[in-house]
Amino acid sequence: MKHNNTKHLTQGAVIAALYVALTLLAKVFGLDSGQIQLRLSEALCILPVFLPAAVPGLTVGCLLANLLCGNIIWDVVFGTLATLLGAVGTRLLRNRPLLALLPPILSNTVIVPFVLTYAYGLPGTVPFFMLTVGLGELISCGLLGRLLYNTLDKHKNQLF
């Protein structure tokens, strides 16, 4: 049992570190925040299909990334909540991989626009931000996440 706990903790920590690293990489190119967001780290949101440790790993990774990027507290709280909800939904839909991509896309598309509008006061409307955030999520989570899923699924017996 102790080995499984250590393995679970290690997997979660590695996923959190990857999430932070990919978010910081996106920040270097100005893709991680603002009206149009393309967080490369969101591709990792498919990982709960393979690993239960991905749920806390993604959540902690998002929390740390938001703190390290200097986001305001409401973004840290609600952005992390959106990631947690998406990760839990993905885990629950792990036997339906195409549907498993939807929870993180939907949670971020619904929650993040309110943060952009009311916490940051960015010019634009909630529906506009739903469109822009949703598009970014479709690319990062839907497209890149699907590519990651296809790659990992071929080798899941060796990896997991």
How should each PLM-predicted stretch be described?
Residues 47-54, 58-62, 71, 75:
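Interfacial helix-start motif at the membrane-water boundary
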Residues 19, 23, 61-66:
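Small-polar-interrupted transmembrane alpha-helices in polytopic inner-membrane proteins
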Residues 27-35, 43, 63-160:
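Membrane-embedded alpha-helical hairpins and interfacial helices in multi-pass inner-membrane proteins
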